[in-house]
Amino acid sequence: MISKIRNENVELFFDALLSLKDKEELYAFFDDICTTNEVLSIAQRFEVAYMLHEGKTYNDISKETGASTATISRVNRSVSDGNGSYDMIFERLEKKEEDK
């Protein structure tokens, strides 16, 4: 999958993301580059992935997030068959929470 998105434009975009210094800069950047619905949709998918990671059922996830079962299924495929980035991020978030 990574090879399908790897190109100069994506490299520049990712470099731009990595150059942002804090959450406020991320908010400002995404406010400029995306519509509200695009950001909310991405955030919803991330929430679905986290809930799948926690072992929640499709029904519970759908009720809590409003995501369709088709969206949950697509996210589940990414979580289980993807590059492992979700697990890496969830571990980091959980460690950050423990360190508080």
Language-model regions: role of each:
Residues 42-56:
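Short, amphipathic alpha-helical "recognition" segments used to contact nucleic acids or chromatin
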Residues 60-65, 72:
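Short alpha-helical "recognition helix" segments of helix-turn-helix
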Residues 25-44:
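Short, Lys/Arg-enriched anionic-surface-contact patches
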Residues 20-21, 27, 100:
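Active-site anion-handling motifs in enzyme catalytic cores
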Residues 53-60, 92-96, 100:
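Long, compositionally biased
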Residues 14, 69-95:
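C-terminal structural segments of small proteins and small subunits
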